[in-house]
A protein has these predicted regions:
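Conserved catalytic or regulatory cores that recognize and/or transform ribose-phosphate-containing ligands
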Residues: 15-147, 152-361
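Cysteine-centered motifs
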Residues: 3-4
């Protein structure tokens, strides 16, 4: 039931022209609330779907050279400390369009410091859900641990491309990694690329580091793997999918879409819209995790205008295809784009904070 000032309740038999007539007579701030209620109350959550899927590439494996991710493509040949770093260098120069979609866990280095993420595994599941492919080069203790976790998680294993160094098999003695996760993935027809490359291990100050044995064979290997990855990733890309409220990445994209439609939202507004209007349970802690992730992925940004507002970036084109409940209250052409443009005009006229946050004042 939607209420208007001095108008009582809007009856279920009122048609859209009646709403527009009422909008002209009530205050603008109330009009914003009315349009918000009409939009959210008529969404049929079970029938919405995902569009414009970002198709990120979540790339895991050995360490990279230094901490500055922007300098990956400037590393000197022969100075790589992991195969992952060498392949990233290759993609940045030979597959530039694909490289733009690469996600590195290092980009989220402050996840623990700011207590944005409950635990690393759940966070990686979220990132993997947003990706079209998860590339894991099995090199180093961290990558071995990720292989064990990723191989048994359906959300990740279906997208997993594993690159495995057979040089880890010494004198025919296979390890747990070989008999366990690798065999499990191959048995379930997942992509496992078996290669071999030399690694030089160094012990310094009680810490083990590694360098790649860079030679012509390794250079040819990097070119081969880069070509293989480009082909395999292209085969996994898709633009649409069914929405599920049980899938963290789908919920994350729903949050991004609400920010896109409403153009400027506070945290509590997002939580209210999802919990109370869409009837989806979402804890504030998890919502903050989604907002943190979306910000680091460049899909939203923050702006303080008295309160903190979350705004869409140019990369955020909306991710939800809405379906609305059948109702005589709505016109056939009612859409999220109509709501977005109408709300923007309302903000300019009578919402100083949002207009300022959006650079409209």
């Amino acid at each position: 039931v939607i209420c208007c000032r001095n108008r009582g309740h809007l009856g279920k038999d009122l048609k859209w022209p009646h709403y527009e007539a009422i909008f002209k007579r009530v205050g603008l701030m109330e009009t914003i609330n009315q349009l918000t209620s009409i939009f959210l109350n008529h969404i049929e959550v079970e029938k919405i779907s995902l569009r414009n899927l970002p198709n990120y590439i979540f790339f895991c494996g050995g360490g990279i050279n230094g901490d500055d991710l922007s300098k990956i493509n400037t590393s000197e040949l022969g100075e790589f400390n992991s195969l992952r770093c060498a392949i990233l260098h290759y993609l940045s120069s030979q597959e530039k369009e694909l490289y733009q979609d690469v996600i590195l866990a290092e980009k989220f280095h402050d996840w623990l410091d700011d207590a944005n993420i409950n635990n690393l595994i759940d966070f990686e599941v979220l990132l993997a859900g947003l990706a079209t492919a998860v590339i894991l080069i099995v090199e180093g203790p961290g990558a071995h641990a990720e292989l064990g976790a990723f191989s048994v998680m359906p959300q990740i294993s279906s997208k997993l491309i594993t690159i495995y160094n057979v040089n880890s098999i010494k004198n025919g003695q296979r390890t747990f990694i070989e008999w366990g996760p690798i065999k499990f993935l191959e048995k379930n027809e997942k992509i496992v690329l078996r290669h071999e490359w030399g690694v030089i291990y160094q012990l310094e100050d009680n810490a083990i580091s590694q360098l790649i044995d860079y030679n012509d064979d390794f250079k040819a290997l990097v070119n081969l793997i880069g070509t293989q990855l480009a082909k395999d990733i292209q085969g996994k890309s898709k633009k649409t999918a069914v929405f599920s409220r049980e899938t963290p990445s789908d919920m994350c994209l729903l949050v991004a879409d609400l920010v896109y439609v409403f153009s400027a939202l506070k945290l509590r507004e997002i939580k209210t819209y999802i919990n109370e209007y869409l009837k989806i349970d979402l804890e504030e802690k998890i919502l903050k995790e989604y907002l943190y992730s979306l910000k680091n992925l460049g899909l939203i940004k923050e702006k303080n205008a008295g309160a903190k507002y979350f705004l869409p970036t140019e990369k955020n084109k909306g991710f939800i295809k809405y379906q609305f409940k059948s109702s005589p209250d709505l016109p056939n052409n009612f859409s999220a784009n109509y709501v977005k443009s109408t709300l923007l005009s309302f903000y300019i006229k009578d919402d100083n904070e949002r207009a300022y946050a959006l650079g409209l004042r």
